[in-house]
A protein has these predicted regions:
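Conserved mid-core alpha-helix of short-chain dehydrogenase/reductase
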Residues: 28, 67-72, 120, 180, ...
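SDR active-site strand-loop-helix element
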Residues: 39-45, 81-87, 135-137
């Protein structure tokens, strides 16, 4: 788990099989693809800042691993392959709200690695006829959110600060906006993509609503401390 915890799955114990493995070592997991219909490739390292500090690790986990999973899916004749892409591939847009047709300009190793994953999926769909779709997630939040990181994790960070009776730490003036997407909507999108007959497509998955960080603070209630942008 790169951002989650094993304990998050306690409520489904006995209903799932958990395999601990390294995706770069296919021998550890390749057998698990037998008799599987759908593959949801959600495994990756997350967050932008750590990717700047560790680009090699991010490319190994987010690009190389995607290649291995695609190859395993192809050889196992998987019926549907769904890739978790990222809205970060758009980079810093020139206009807000940002049109879907905006240029793809990844500006950090994490964003670039996720975009390269999209391109791998497109290539496998075109060349090998692997039925595959990529979904670009926008700032996912919800139950059992992590309490560290940036962007989508801001809810978890703020909730942890609220429970500790600490002020919310707001980077900059707090007027920056994000499209936050609730986790159950993400799950619905994943299932819809798997049930669809579409292939070699990329879709944005968001709430179509922008919310400022200051608005989140207002909704949660409490004091805030503004800190400079990095």
């Amino acid at each position: 788990f790169s951002t989650g915890r094993k304990e998050n799955l306690d409520h489904v114990k006995g209903k799932i099989k958990l395999v601990k493995c390294d995706l770069s070592n296919k021998g550890e997991w390749i057998e698990e693809f037998k008799n599987v219909d759908w593959v949801f490739h959600l495994a990756s390292l997350a967050d932008i800042v750590p990717s700047i500090q560790n680009p090699e690790g991010y490319f190994s986990s987010n690009v190389d691993a995607t290649f291995y999973v695609l190859e395993a899916s192809r050889h196992a004749n998987i019926k549907r392959f769904i890739y978790s892409a990222s809205s970060s591939c758009y980079g810093i847009p020139d206009e807000y709200p940002t049109p879907e047709g905006s240029d793809i300009r990844p500006q950090y190793p994490y964003a670039l690695a996720k975009r390269m994953g999209e391109e791998l999926v497109e290539h496998w769909a075109q060349l090998y006829n692997l039925p595959a779709i990529s979904l670009r997630f926008f700032n996912v939040y919800g139950t059992r959110s992590r309490t560290s990181g940036t962007y989508g994790a801001v809810f978890g960070v703020f909730l942890a600060q609220k429970l500790a009776n600490k002020p919310y730490t707001v980077v900059g003036d707090g007027n920056q906006t994000r499209d936050f997407t609730y986790v159950t909507d993400i799950v619905s999108a994943l299932i819809a993509a798997a049930e669809s007959e579409k292939t070699n497509k990329i879709y944005n998955v968001g709430s179509d609503t922008t919310v400022s960080v200051n608005k989140i603070v207002e909704l949660l209630g409490g004091n805030k401390v503004n800190i400079p942008k990095r």
